Amino acid sequence: MSSLYRDLDSDVSSTRIVRHSYNVYRGSSPSSQNRLESRIRELEDSLDSEREMRLRYEKQSAELTFQLDQMADRLEDAMGTSTTVSEVSRKREAEVNKVRKDLELSCAQFEATEQNMRRRHQEALNDLTDQLEHMGKSKSRAEKEKNQLIIEIDSLQAMNDGLQKSKMSADSKIDALEGSNSRLKAAVDDLTRQLNDSNLSKARLTQENFDLQHQVQELDGANAGLAKAKAQLQILCDDLKRNLDDESRQRQNLQVQLAAIQSDYDNLNARYEEESENASSLRAQLSSLSATYAALKTKYDKELMAKQEELEEIRRRLSIKIQELEDTCEQLRTRCNTLEKTKNKLTVEIREITIELENTQIIVQDLTKRNRQLENENAALQKRCDDLSAENGQLRNEKANLEAECARLKVANAELAEKNANLERENAGLQNALREANNELKAANRTINELTALKAQLEAERDNLASALRDTEEALRDAEAKLAAAQAALNQLRSEMEQRLREKDEEIDSIRKSSARAIDELQRTLVEVETRYKTEISRIKKKYETDIRELEGALDNANRANAEYLKQIKSLQNRNRELELQLEEATRQLDDTRNQLSVSERKRITIQQELEDARSLLEHAERARKNAENELGEVTVRLTEVQLQVTALTNDKRRMEADIAAMQSDLDDALNGQRAAEERADRLQAEVNRLADELRQEQDNYKNAESLRKQLEIEIREITVRLEEAEAFAQREGKRQIAKLQARIRDLENELEADQRRLREAAASARKFERQWKETVQASDEDRRQVAELTSITDQLTMKCKTYKRMIEEAEDVASITMNKYRKAQSLIDEAEQRADMAEKNLQTVRRSRSMSVSREVTRVVRV
């Protein structure tokens, strides 16, 4: 109808203008007559066409004159809609260009992120393969130790058989000794003859007494060395106490930092609630807009039922837009749900951090218990030193009394029983250490399961990125198809407008020129807006690039710190090797002294060999304990490495969350410009669906990881049960053999007391000194070993505390960076909204001016 009115007005104005021109040029000069005749012919042709059109429109003139006043307003509205259609087409072209540029930028960003993710994924795979190889080696080592234990058990069984055979031979010897005793009773008379020999033996005993005094002096020197070692142990205990105080302070600092992190989390939760309220307000605005749009739609449906097919097509497009806006609303709801899920994940991670802090507190309590044990052992060493000094005084006073030395032999038997009890206590300590090692192995397996889950998550993210790239390509194709359709529609409109413009006169040309000027002004404003958006996008891109560079620099600094910590660990290992060399030198000196004492113990070789067999069994147990301690150290080192990898992965995860927050800001920008960027909303919908798929895949991967973890825990429990059974069997066999050896030693000592009292008493005194010296040396070695263990444990705890501090600092840095990014994005959104409002106001003013100018020109033509 609007086009019909426009044609009718143009025809009426042209007829009136022709008549007016004819009346003007009828009496002109003959110089311009030729030019006017050609003009008159053209005007006559136009008059003929106008007469035909007038005959065609005379029937409608009566109705149109009656409705002319009413349709003037409608004409203004229709002209406004036509201009809006042209403006919408131009805006769509500009938006298509923007979408292409955004797609190119997103493709470049996706390619860069894909390369980074591939590199990180490859590094994580390499680390995991190294850890799996290391675990395989440790497993093979455990199997070898198991085979060695089986071999040792077989050897113990063989030794048991040999001991039974030696028992039989000892019984036969006892029978022979009883016969010899009867013969000795018969030879009492011969002993009187041997009084002279006894005098000679007395002189020999005095010489041996002199030698024993010399040995007592040497033992005094050894006592002085033990006192020095005692002082050194006291210094080490003081250092350990200081370290424990420092660790308690560090634990308090960690608790304070955890409280700060909790407060930050509460602040973030409050901000999230504010954002949800803003989203609800946006939804309310959308609902109000949809209501207003429905009212306008009903109004125009009642008024414009008789319009052409172009307006119907525009109506269909608007209905499609409404559906797309409703889809975007649903997408926003799903995105809010995903944000709530991420919030739940963050709460779970905070709970895991609290669990790790509780584990550190348990480790500190274990260290305090070990410190108390060291203090108790130090008190026991002091008691031993006092006992040694008392025994030295007793030896000096009881040199002349052989009967008192027999009582001392009984005391030595009691000391052997005490030594057996001490060995049982040490065995219990070894069992506790093995249990701790098993607990740490369980923790290591738990961390390995977490790493496998993270690996699966990274693979799922890689697949999701590939699917997102495919979706973006499909969206680009759809956008190109829509652009081609829009261009075809524009071409059709252009051809129709050209046909109509050819039929119009010069006055309508002036109107067209004025409209072209207004359109040029609108295009200039649109170009300015586009340039502003482009500059803002480039500036935001530069900011993100600078943030990425800063994060890469922080990662390089963390790698450097890790290298420094590895250097410190190597230096500590070198120091440990030096201490082991010193221990080897001390053992060599002990071997020399043992060789010297073996000369005085030739008559007791058989008993000494049996005792050495028992000691070899104890040494095997100590070696197994050392191997378990070494494995424990390796497990702790492995745990530190796994923790570092977990921190790196958490940093990557936080970076991905920052990227997701940036995408959220982009989505908010798209909501602000949803009427002008519909295709961008489709792309965001695809990204939301992709994120939902990623969450589902992560849940599936988590379930698979849980099943694998349960299987590994079952296998570890079976292995620990087998090891405990083997240890219990070895302990039982060792106790039985020790009891048998003690019984045999008592029997042989009783026999030797009956036959060779004097020689046995001297040898027993020398043996007692040797035994005491060996006990003191072994006690000092055990104390040194325990001190070394405590130092290694304290170093490991300090490393763990440092790693926890570094993790907390990194978390604070990431939180501050994300907050800064969020504030920057919020400021950018506010600026973009202000600019959009200004642009809308400018467009409205231009439209009003355009509609006013067009209405004025139409009224002027109608009046003419």
Swiss-Prot record:
Gene Ontology CC: one annotated term: myosin filament
Tagged with keyword Membrane: no
**Cross-referenced InterPro entries:** Myosin_tail (IPR002928), XRCC4-like_C (IPR014751)
The entry's keywords: Coiled coil, Cytoplasm, Motor protein, Muscle protein, Myosin, Phosphoprotein, Thick filament
Q: Any idea where this protein resides?
A: Cytoplasm, Myofibril
Has keyword Coiled coil?
Answer: yes
Q: Quick one: where's region Nonhelical region?
A: 1-30, 854-864
The record, for Gene3D superfamilies, names: 1.20.5.340, 1.20.5.370
- Which residues does UniProt call coiled coil? 31-853
UniProt tissue specificity = Most abundantly expressed in muscle tissues from byssus retractor and adductor muscles. Low expression in foot, gill, inner mantle and outer mantle.
Spell out the post-translational modification annotation for this entry.
Answer: Phosphorylated.
- Describe its assembly: Homodimer.
Family under the similarity heading: Belongs to the paramyosin family.
What is its biological role? Paramyosin is a major structural component of many thick filaments isolated from invertebrate muscles.
* Protein name, per record: Paramyosin
Q: Which organism is it from?
A: Mytilus galloprovincialis
